[in-house]
């Protein structure tokens, strides 16, 4: 589809996807893992990266279907935030929600099962828990990321496949509902 922004581009505008379906792609760990998600609208591209130490997009975004966007430059966002309390409150809520998500994901740092470790990696890379996850990664690389052997990761992925939680292809994992992956 049509590229909106690329991973690493400067985030100097609020970009609202008003209609259509947008895909995000994140490459991490020296491109050893690539996570693709689809998002329904309305959707705002990484508003938390408009300010702060890292003002670059974490993902690449492209339109999966025809749609429309609204782009508001940062200087206009600044003026709107100075003028309207509701804009300031919304930006504060977005930032706090992002921070709470990161804190909650890292709270239970010690995990026991391989499935929990896979869940943590996928959640850490995901922008939302709502959409299906398409993960391109070699089993050896995933094993290295979670500190497990390739054999143990293979067994767990096959178990997830047999339970209907994940679809496994060579170098690819598809998880339709990330909440199914989480251990109780």
Q: What role is predicted for each listed range?
A:
Residues 64, 82-150:
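Polybasic "coupling" helices that flank or enter modular domains
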Residues 3, 21-26, 44, 68-69:
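Short beta-strand segments in beta-sandwich/barrel cores
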């Amino acid at each position: 589809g049509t590229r909106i922004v690329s991973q690493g581009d400067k985030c100097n505008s609020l970009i609202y996807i008003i209609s259509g379906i947008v895909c995000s792609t994140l490459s991490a760990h020296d491109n050893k893992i690539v996570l693709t998600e689809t998002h329904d609208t309305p959707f705002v591209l990484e508003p938390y990266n408009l300010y702060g130490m890292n003002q670059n997009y974490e993902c690449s975004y492209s339109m999966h279907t025809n749609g429309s966007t609204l782009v508001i430059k940062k200087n206009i966002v600044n003026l709107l935030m100075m003028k309207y309390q509701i804009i300031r409150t919304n930006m504060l809520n977005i930032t706090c929600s992002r921070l709470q998500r990161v804190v909650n994901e890292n709270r239970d740092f010690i995990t026991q099962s391989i499935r929990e470790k896979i869940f943590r990696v996928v959640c850490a890379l995901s922008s939302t828990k709502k959409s299906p996850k398409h993960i391109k990664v070699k089993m050896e690389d995933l094993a290295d990321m979670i500190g497990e052997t390739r054999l143990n990761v293979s067994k767990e992925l096959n178990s997830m496949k047999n339970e209907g939680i994940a679809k496994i292809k060579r170098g690819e994992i598809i998880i339709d509902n990330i909440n199914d992956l989480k251990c109780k």
